[in-house]
């Protein structure tokens, strides 16, 4: 059954032709355009990320929702529309039915982008960092849908680890419990967004993209094999000091508790506080992380195609 025929999708011509011809495609989220960066940095970064994917040999597919249908691949005009709109709701997996049914507009998170990518037949997705288990989740139960979607969708996610504002130790425990393979590319450490190390060792290290592609393929052949998380640290010249960032976050978490900031608002508040306390340096680091992960994701998608011409067809048929 072709689910994409039943869910309202609008493919860009570039993405449609790439998927039909078996070319490597990398999905991208739109939440970073509407909520992650300010204008015009959001537009510049979105285009730079797409260009990084193209220069790696793959086709970028920025995902969003507009007029009640998924956009799989955005034009420059559509990116500009998302970047300048006064209010675009942040849409995670559970919000998709309501936003599509109401004919509205929505910026897709990691979780909803992964879901849309899977339905569209795209096997690779990249983001600066995934959501995870929040600090204090033992009482708040604040766990990102990014994690649960990884356990459900057969998509390989390339990122710079989990955001520093999270409890990364518990995030790794969650991924282990739900059998999500975590592979760090050319690094022993699990990165933390714009910090090269979170202080935690990565469960697995692989140094060749072709081997990572093979591991992904094998995972999808196994019963129950779903998402795979591939982490790549930001470049040394773009990295921030993990200890300094952690001190800022600890203080921001305390302030958030005093102000009763919870749920979807918490992540944005904490990231804004980090940006403020670093005099905007973290925002620039964020942009660099996005481009770096896009480059690696593109190369990985290409490696998957090169190692086996039937890679995507074989997985899709299962």
Curated annotation (Swiss-Prot):
Protein name: Pseudouridine-5'-phosphate glycosidase 1
Organism expressing this protein natively: Photorhabdus laumondii subsp. laumondii (strain DSM 15139 / CIP 105565 / TT01)
EC number: 4.2.1.70
GO biological process: nucleobase catabolic process
Cofactor dependence: Mn(2+)
Details of cofactor binding: Binds 1 Mn(2+) ion per subunit.
Annotated positions binding Mn(2+): 142
Active site positions: 29 (proton donor), 163 (nucleophile)
Binding residues annotated for substrate, in chain numbering: 90, 110, 144-146
């Amino acid at each position: 059954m072709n689910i994409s025929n039943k869910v309202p999708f609008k493919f860009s011509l570039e993405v449609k032709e790439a998927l039909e011809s078996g070319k490597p495609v990398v999905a991208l989220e739109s939440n970073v355009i509407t909520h992650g960066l300010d204008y015009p940095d959001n537009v510049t970064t979105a285009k730079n990320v797409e260009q990084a994917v193209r220069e790696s040999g793959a086709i970028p597919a920025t995902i969003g929702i507009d007029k009640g249908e998924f956009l799989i691949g955005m034009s420059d005009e559509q990116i500009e529309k998302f970047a300048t709109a006064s209010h675009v709701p942040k849409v995670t997996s559970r919000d998709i039915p309501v936003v599509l049914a109401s004919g509205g507009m929505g910026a897709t998170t990691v979780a909803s982008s992964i879901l849309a990518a899977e339905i569209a037949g795209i096997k690779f997705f990249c983001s600066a960092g995934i959501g995870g288990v929040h600090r204090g989740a033992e009482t708040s139960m604040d766990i990102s849908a990014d994690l649960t979607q990884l356990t459900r969708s057969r998509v390989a996610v390339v990122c710079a680890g989990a955001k520093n504002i999270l409890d990364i130790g518990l995030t790794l425990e969650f991924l282990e419990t739900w059998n999500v393979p975590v592979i760090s590319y050319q690094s022993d450490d699990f990165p933390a967004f714009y910090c090269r190390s979170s202080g935690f060792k990565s469960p697995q290290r692989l140094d060749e993209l072709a081997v990572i592609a093979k591991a992904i393929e094998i995972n999808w052949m196994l019963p129950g094999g779903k998402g795979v998380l591939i982490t790549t640290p930001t470049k040394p010249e773009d990295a921030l000091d993990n200890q300094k960032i952690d001190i800022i976050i600890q203080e921001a978490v305390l302030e958030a508790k005093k102000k009763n900031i919870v749920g979807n608002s918490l992540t944005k508040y904490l990231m804004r506080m980090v940006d403020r306390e670093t005099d905007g340096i973290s925002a620039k680091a964020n942009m660099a992380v996005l481009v770096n992960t896009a480059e690696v994701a593109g190369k990985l998608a290409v490696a998957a195609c090169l190692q086996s011409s039937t890679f995507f067809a074989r997985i899709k048929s299962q």
